[in-house]
From Swiss-Prot:
GO terms for molecular function: translation release factor activity, codon specific. It comes from the Bacteria. Peptide chain release factor 1 directs the termination of translation in response to the peptide chain termination codons UAG and UAA. It comes from Sphingopyxis alaskensis (strain DSM 13593 / LMG 18877 / RB2256) (Sphingomonas alaskensis). This is Peptide chain release factor 1. It is found in: Cytoplasm. Methylated by PrmC. Methylation increases the termination efficiency of RF1. The modification N5-methylglutamine is found at Q232. Keywords: Cytoplasm, Methylation, Protein biosynthesis. PROSITE patterns: RF_PROK_I (PS00745). Signal peptide: none annotated. Transmembrane segments: none annotated.
């Protein structure tokens, strides 16, 4: 386990106290007060964890000194055991607080689900995944808004893009990127044979205009008449938008809204998220040699999870976790899965700090 030095702990506590004292004076410019308040709030849980480590370490020193007193020795031995049992957990909690934060963790996310191998069954599975994430979002108090959807004739989706907004969305959904595989007997299968299908999930942190500089000269915008399933026109105006980002070749098509203006706004929302994600991928690649985390790799071609209907199980291959709760998970009971992925990522990053 990575141990936090006494010097680091002192620096944390001193900085927290200094910020508190400075804000209490009332002699700060509004902008400075806002900045100090933000830093103070971010430092609060770290300082609390640091003080708990200090308390336990000091208590351990005092108890060890009591061992020299014959009358106090028995009690001291018992209390030393209790403190020694509590200290590693407190130090672990502090180390977690000190891990570098992903600046995107607090952001909303763009959720993209695409049917892969398996034809109609893959499209139905893509629909099941959207429902699973939507139900999970409900349990978290998040809002899900469909940005664009290419529905399959049999049901489900060939491709669907949704915006998920709320507290800490990306932090919890970011490990969902990858290939999700389903094994089940399709409703159209008369012989009872199990088929394997797949869908690809991409979770991108939503980006603000200030995050990504997009020059109008870098965009090629095509406007045309929107069409629905089978090619029929869904309205009589040229409202569909196709935006091509020339430097990267990224293409976003948006036709779900009747208003050209709304379609353009949503297309730009998706484009910003994809460009921001590209920048994050470059940064991740640069850090890859320093941090070999399978959980956080974000490789969207990697098979990450299997949903096996005959056995009623869900297996996450990255952490070798199998849960025999498939119906509940598909209804949004994803906490156990997501918490396990977050814990494994934290463990790997802590191990990286200790190397």
């Amino acid at each position: 386990m990575t141990s936090v030095s006494a010097r680091q702990i002192d620096a944390i506590i001193e900085r927290h106290a200094a910020l508190q004292a400075r804000m209490a004076t009332g002699d700060m410019a509004p902008a400075d007060f806002v900045a100090a308040s933000k830093e103070f709030a971010e430092l609060e849980p770290v300082a609390t964890a640091a003080r708990e480590v200090v308390r336990l370490r000091e208590e351990l020193v005092a108890l060890n000194e009591m061992l020299a007193d014959p009358e106090m020795k028995a009690m001291a031995v018992e209390e030393i055991a209790a403190v020694e049992a509590a200290l590693p957990a407190a130090e672990h909690d502090l180390a977690l607080q000190l891990l570098p934060k992903d600046v995107a963790d607090s952001r909303a996310a763009m959720l993209e689900i695409r049917a892969g191998t398996g034809g109609d069954e893959a499209a139905l599975f893509a629909g099941d995944l959207l429902r699973m994430y939507s139900r999970y979002a409900d349990t978290q108090g998040w809002k899900v808004e469909i940005i664009s959807a290419n529905e399959a004739e049999v049901g489900g989706y060939k491709e669907v893009v949704a915006s998920v907004s709320g507290q800490g969305v990306f932090a919890k959904l970011k490990f969902e990127s990858g290939v999700h595989r389903v094994q089940r007997v399709p409703v159209t299968e008369s012989g009872g044979r199990i088929h394997t299908s797949a869908a690809t999930v991409a979770v991108l942190p939503e980006a603000e205009e200030v995050d990504v500089a997009i020059n109008d000269s870098d965009l090629k915008i095509d406007i045309y008449r929107a069409s629905g399933a089978g090619g029929q026109h869904v309205n009589t105006t040229d409202s569909a938008i196709r935006i091509t980002h020339i430097p990267t070749g990224l293409v976003v098509i948006q036709q779900d809204q009747r208003s050209q203006h709304k379609n353009r706004a949503k297309a730009m929302q998706v484009l910003r998220a994809r460009l921001y994600d590209l920048e994050r991928e470059k940064l991740h690649s640069a850090e890859a040699s320093a941090r070999k985390s399978m959980v956080g790799s974000g490789d969207r071609s990697e098979r990450i999870r299997t949903y096996n209907f005959p056995q009623g199980r869900v297996t996450d291959h990255r952490i070798n976790l199998t849960l025999h709760r498939l119906p509940e998970i598909l209804e949004g009971a994803m906490d156990e899965l997501i918490d396990a992925l977050i814990a494994e990522d934290q463990a790997q990053r802590l191990a990286g700090l200790g190397e």
